[in-house]
């Protein structure tokens, strides 16, 4: 991803939604809604001071909510762009106008708590379709103990646990007590073939 971010022919737009596409191969016009980050990508030096002083602690979605992070944060170390962002749903200023600690902590003056969404119109030559995936309903997983037994984790949660950059630095430990797992049952394709 970092190498992609350096390409002069590729523009990475995060926190965005594709609204419409018109045109033909080699000549498309795309309308994109870019949601606010509340931290200017061009000014942010990724020093982390905004997160260091942010008083709000939230579940870390990148680590499948197995850990916590500050509300002013970068999703992961190799994120592109490298700038931090603020989740408006959990921001004390956005919800109660009660805090601006991050603004005074940021020496680069990159924080803009008034940033608005932008509508972009892009002329592009090619489209890379990345449809993503849907999460399985927790109801399907309940019969296997998920949500009731703390050591039952999803495949994505297990992936974060085994990753060297994950919350346990690749050590497979039980969420219930932080001890090493001695036996593991790996159930695959749960809910995938359900109609």
Task: Specify the residue positions occupied by each region the protein language model found.
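Flexible, charged surface loops at secondary-structure boundaries
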Residues: 5-6, 121-123, 176-181
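Active-site/binding-pocket entry motifs
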Residues: 134-135, 158-159, 192
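Central beta-strand plus flanking loop segment that forms part of the substrate or channel wall
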Residues: 150-163
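A structural motif corresponding to the C-terminal end of an alpha-helix
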Residues: 3-11
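Rossmann-like NAD(P)H-binding beta-loop-alpha module
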Residues: 45, 170-195
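Non-heme iron-sulfur electron-transfer modules
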Residues: 1, 13-43, 55-129, 133-153
